[in-house]
Amino acid sequence: MPPASEVAVTAPFAGTVIAIAHEPPEPVRAGAAVVVLEAMKMEHEVVAEADGVVRRLEVAVGDTVDEGQLLAVLARGEASAATRDETETVDLDTIRDDLAAVRERHAIGLDGARPDAVARRHEGGQRTARENLADLVDPGTYVEYGPLIYAAQERRRSREDLIARTPADGLVAGVGEVDGAPTVVMSYDYTVLAGTQGMRGHLKKDRLFEVAERRRLPVVLFAEGGGGRPGDVDWPMVAGLDCRAFHLFGRLSGLVPLVGIASGYCFAGNAALLGSCDVVIATEDSSIGMGGPAMIEGGGLGVHEPGEVGPIEVQDANGVVDLRVADEREAVTAARRYLSYFRGPTGDPVTVPDQRTLRHLIPEQRKRIYDVRAVVGGVFDEGSVLELRRGFGLGIVTALARVDGHPLGVVANDPSHLGGAIDAHGADKAARFLQLCDAFDLPVLFLCDTPGFMVGPAAERTATVRHFGRLFVIGANLTVPTGTIVLRKGYGLGAQAMAGGGFKAPLFTVGWPTSEFGGMGLEGAVRLGMRRELEAIEDAQEREQAFQTAVAAAYEHGAGINMAAHGEIDDVIDPADSRRWIATLFDPPPPDWRARAHKKRPNVDTW
């Protein structure tokens, strides 16, 4: 043991002396290095345990020492003020050379370093990838993955050129909060090789898709781009069909909300990812297709301009697009709004439309058309309705909405299209929406006004038997609360499909005063059921009178009040009481999907 006036400096482990930090008789403060040892190719400072002056050294540079070996002896004493100032003062604003180099490299890929590319983007009426992500995520919450990668093309271009011209390999991606909720966000960068999918970019996607799966994070993807990139010559491959991105992304379906945004040209692999999303948001200038002009021409299918491949007018009407918006700014707003329905109750004060208005929205004249969207808007919290796929399956309205801040899904018949009859497209639209709601624990309200399924030779050529079957199979297997309100017509199998397969399947089935019911269209039922009686009447005028009398009796028998009196529905209600039924029967809401360990459904059907 050294005397109390001395401090021993010993080796904490075996190593080699590579430097002497303080020589005798230099003063040294507590915590300052006396000797530097190297062990396992790492340098370790051996520090003084107390202030003092170096009295003697027991080792020299190059010596090998054992653990516990004496290295130096200090005489206890206070280090000089100069020594303290020299060793303790650190300018926290100083940027070291290594950090400066990292910052410089990051800056190369930012919009500020690429003014020409940014200008071209703005001239075309679009924003950059980074501008879109900055608009989407909450300020100060975004962390980027893989900003330093570049295209795998060093066999044909210089590294400096690739760093400058292919930043992030054309895919800007990371994690940030969207209205307070962590979300994986990514955008192809059309200013980099036309937004094509590079091999290193694929690895970045893979990484983030796995992060989304492990953390249960929603994904928002800006998908503009030209598909696969054949020019990544550094990557040893034949066809690249072992790419994992599409498998990993498809595995997220039904696990987390997936939002795809298309602006400009979105072809091939980019479109494949877009089409795998739960919701597709597309701008007016978008053109979406599974093959771009080069692929089309290469297949001998003619020469086409990019805008001719899958313009918004086509893709909106055929059901590819869920939300049609003017531009990228509106697309970001729509994405934020869509995601809000998957975070539970808002907790914000709500404005409730005057429920008395609902009493007057269905005409007393039973054949008069009305606006079913006015009904939807009148039932739910003001401003809370977000309609999906409005341009497709026109006889069905599918929307997300809220009652007292609680989110739910709405499926309604639109009598202005085919009188509310359900056709193949309408059935597909409703069936897919039901899967979406069930996957993420959103209760479903059906607003029924249908004469039934669309029939006839033309309808059967659209494979209605199978399309209609989807409604029954999916509806019967919903695990979320459901309810049905019959606004006017509730006829046949179509009406049953608007109740999950039958009027006893929902938690409640009620009618408004205008509701009417039948196993099939009543005129057809009378003609079929009274065929012999009607044929026996020789006088045509008398026969028609008998028919009309029977039809009137059938309508009276099928009135909502009589239906409720026979217990086939739960009640006929004042339309102004509709919200009370919804709020009461859908409370408590289903568990939050984010708390589940596994998927409820294997996936959400993309169609």
Regions found by a protein language model. Name each.
Residues 13, 40-42, 498:
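Methionine-biased hydrophobic packing positions in alpha-helices, especially
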Residues 82-607:
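Ligand-binding clefts of soluble mixed alpha/beta catalytic domains
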Residues 26-47, 66-82:
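Short hydrophobic beta/alpha edge segments that flank linear recognition/processing sites
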Residues 1-36:
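Acidic, low-complexity mobile loops and tails
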Residues 11-17, 48-56, 65:
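Generic structural motif
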Residues 2-9, 39, 78-94:
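Periplasmic scaffold and linker elements that assemble and bridge Gram-negative envelope complexes
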Residues 13, 29, 50, 66, ...:
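A cytosolic small-molecule/anion-sensing beta-strand core signal
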